[in-house]
């Protein structure tokens, strides 16, 4: 109801993770388990799995466990002191560190075109403050 009425929601750490439709690290016994006994997030971001503290805790490869089992999901890893602000289908990165995007594509600031890689590749890329991403199209916005 809050979002439907134009309100704002937020969350950090596990509070950010639960905003996606898939709950990463939702195990009641151990937060190192990526696909635990609780897998349903709030679904504010549809077909998305969100992880947190990804660089500070060296977790940037953990998302692949989920994506191997649920390849339709978009993986988003948010590092400490960093956030995404979502408006409609677009998110923008704010903060000191990076957001890691797992969409099966390669992207570079140095002018590379977006390229689809074989599904077996464990590929991700980083977005920094000010970068924007279209959740619906699964593309970076320039």
What is the meaning of each model-derived region?
Residues 23-142:
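C-terminal and late-domain segments of enzyme folds
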Residues 1-3, 63-64:
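Short amphipathic alpha-helical segments and helix-helix/interface helices
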Residues 2-22:
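Catalytic nucleophile loop
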């Amino acid at each position: 109801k809050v979002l439907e009425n134009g309100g704002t929601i937020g969350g950090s750490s596990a509070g950010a993770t639960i905003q996606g439709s898939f709950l990463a690290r939702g195990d009641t016994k151990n937060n190192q388990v990526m696909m635990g006994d609780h897998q349903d997030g709030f679904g504010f971001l549809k077909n998305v799995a969100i992880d947190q503290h990804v660089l500070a805790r060296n977790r940037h490869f953990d998302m692949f466990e989920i994506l191997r089992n649920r390849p339709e999901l978009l993986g988003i890893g948010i590092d400490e002191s960093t956030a995404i602000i979502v408006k409609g289908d677009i998110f923008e990165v704010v903060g000191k560190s990076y957001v890691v995007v797992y969409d099966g594509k390669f992207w570079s600031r140095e002018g590379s075109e977006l390229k689809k890689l074989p599904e077996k590749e464990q590929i991700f890329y980083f977005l920094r403050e000010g970068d924007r991403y279209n959740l619906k199209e699964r593309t970076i916005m320039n």
